[in-house]
Amino acid sequence: VDKFVIQGPTPLNGTIPISGSKNAALPLMAAALLGDGPTTITNVPKLKDIYTFNNVIRVTGAQVDFDESDEELTINPDNIGHLEAPYDLVRKMRASFYMLGALVGKYGKAKVSLPGGCAWGPRPVDLHLGGMRAMGIDISLEEGYVYAQAPDAIGKASFTLEPSSVGATINLVLASVLQADKFVLHNAAKEPDVVLLCETLAEMGADIDGIGTNTLTIRGVDSLNSITVRNAPDRIETGTFMIAAAMHPDSEITLTGTDPSELGVFPEYFNKTGAACTIDGTDIHIKAPDEIRPVSIDTGVYPGFPTDLQAQWCTMMTQAAGESTVTDTIYDDRFSYVPELVRLGADIAVEQNSACVNGPVPLSSASVMSTDLRASVSLVLAAMVAKGTTDVLRIYHLDRGYEDLEQKLSSVGAHIERVDQNEDG
C-alpha cells in the first residue's frame, strides 16, 4: 500500500496537461456494448476504475483492447454470451452497475451485483430499478444481485427521476435505446457526461430527443453501429488543479487540453477568490491571488457547483482571509475529510451538510488518511501549502480517479513522492 510524502509549502509553476474524464469514459464503455462490431474510445485515462470496468466487460465475453500508449480503448461486444457482472468486480466500483442498463438494453436480460464504490453516504439504486420497472422490465433482487428480464416488447412508458441522478439517467438511457417503443425520462440529469453519452448513442444510430435538457425522449431502434468517439477532458481534474494553483501566492500554471465550457458555474466562483483565470480555447491560465477572498458555495446539479470539487474548495478556504461556508446539497455525508484537515491545523466546524471554514490559518505537517477519492486529493492540496513533511495515507483512492497525479504535480514544482506505506498502516 502506497502513501504520498509531501513537503511544503511550494509554489506551482508550469504547464499541466488534463487527462480524459473517467466519469465520461465509463458510460461510453457501457454504450460500446450496445453496438454491432468494435467501438473505439480515444483519450481514455489510465486509471484503476477503467481497468476494473474493462475486467467487468471481459466477463461477458466481449473483447477489450486498451492501447495505453495511444490512450485508445476498443470494445467488441459481438461474442458476448455471459450476461452477468459479478460481485467481486462490481463491488470495487459503483459505475459497474451501468452493466445492468447495457445488458438488459441489448440482450433483454441481466444479472448484476449491487455496487460498492466510495465509502460516503447512501447510494440507493432504487431510481435505476424504478425506471426500468416503469419500462416494464421485470426486476428482482436475490442474494445481493439484481435480476432483470425485459418483456418481448416494451411499449410507451415514462418515468420521473426524483431526485435527478446522473447514474440513473445513464442506466435508463442504456436500457431503452434498443428496447423501448417510446420512453420519456423526466428530470433527467444534463451533466456533460450524460450529454456526451447521448450524442455518442445518437451517432451510433439511436433516436434521442432533448439531449442536454431535463427531458429525454427515446424511441427504440433495431440496432446500433460501432463508431470511434473521443472521450471528454476531465472537468474535475481541471477544477482541482485550478484550486491547487490558487492556494500558494507565487503559483502560476497553465492547464492544456481541457474544455472550459463544461465547467458550469465553477470559473465564476473561482474568479471571486481573487485568482486570475484566463481562458484561451482549450487552455486555462491561472495566477494565484496575493490574498484569497472567502467565497461560500452550495453544491448543485450541473451547471451548479460540482459536489466532486467541494472538498478541494473547502481546503482552499482554509487559506482565505475570512469566514466561508461550504454546503453540499447533493450528499449529506461528504465531510469525512474535515477531521484530517483539522489535524493539519484547519479551523472548520461541520454541522449537518455544511462546513464553516475560518481562515487564513497556517497549516503544518501531520500524517493524514484518505477516506474517498475527492477527499484524498483535498489532503494533497493541503499538504502542498502546509509547513513541513506530510504523509497522506491510503492513496489507492486517488489512483481510482487521478491519472499520474504525483508526476503532474512534481512537473510544476511540488515536492511529492510515492512511497510504500509498509507498517504505517
Would you name each region that the model predicts?
Residues 1-425:
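Short, structured segments at the rim of ligand-binding sites
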